[in-house]
């Protein structure tokens, strides 16, 4: 989004240009790790009065997450379901995208390929991810964002959030790298070409 469209998108979702906006978009289940994100922004709120974690989506974990946010007085906004056509605006007006996905049931429940990270990347937004399953493949640590080794490590998550929020140039570089990687490695055309090569379709 250009600056004008970004400002308008923020107003549409109830935020301002001054908001330090971290966005998470997902089905709300324990594996997605939004409880860790809530704890992290709660730690940062005293020094970052404009910080907001905006969580879009619905699911069985929403009630627990809302209760946690209230208990911690965390700067969290629950947006509920966001229309598919509005998702690019929500991604595009964020400073950071996060989903701290974790393994559960001794690794039997893991994150699949992190398509939401690719969607955020395509919008030029750096990401903070958990290390479960394909999420760590979707985010290139130190290049397009950060991957947290232990998804419950609130201190590390808060440090990565601060690193990005404190450094607009780093966010810009990671955003550009994210966009390039999304186009060059994860576009439908590139994936179709790779599958074609694997199965000999184009030979």
Language-model region placement:
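Acidic anion/phosphate-binding donor-loop and adjacent secondary structure
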Residues: 1-11
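Nucleotide-activated donor-binding/catalytic signature segment of Leloir-type glycosyltransferases, i.e.
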Residues: 63-88, 96
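Acidic donor-binding loop of glycosyltransferase active sites
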Residues: 92-110, 125
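Short hydrophobic beta-strand element within catalytic cores of glycosyltransferases
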Residues: 117, 122, 126-129, 139
């Amino acid at each position: 989004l250009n600056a004008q469209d970004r400002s308008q998108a923020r107003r549409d979702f109830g935020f301002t240009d001054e908001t330090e906006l971290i966005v998470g978009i997902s089905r709300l289940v324990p594996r997605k790790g939004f409880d860790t994100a809530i704890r992290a922004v709660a730690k940062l709120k005293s020094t970052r009065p404009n910080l907001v974690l905006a969580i879009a989506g619905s699911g069985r974990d929403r009630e627990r997450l809302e209760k946690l946010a209230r208990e911690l007085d965390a700067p969290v906004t629950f947006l509920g379901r966001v229309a598919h056509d509005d998702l690019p605006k929500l991604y595009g007006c964020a400073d950071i995208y996060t989903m701290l996905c974790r393994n559960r049931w001794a690794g039997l429940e893991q994150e699949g390929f992190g398509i939401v990270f690719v969607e955020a990347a395509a919008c030029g937004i750096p990401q903070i991810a958990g290390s479960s399953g394909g999420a760590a493949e979707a985010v290139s640590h130190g290049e397009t964002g950060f991957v947290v080794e232990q998804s419950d490590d609130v201190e590390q998550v808060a440090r990565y959030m601060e690193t990005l929020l404190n450094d607009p140039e780093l966010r810009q570089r990671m955003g550009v790298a994210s966009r390039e990687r999304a186009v060059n490695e994860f576009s439908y055309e590139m994936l179709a070409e790779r599958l074609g090569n694997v199965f000999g379709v184009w030979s």
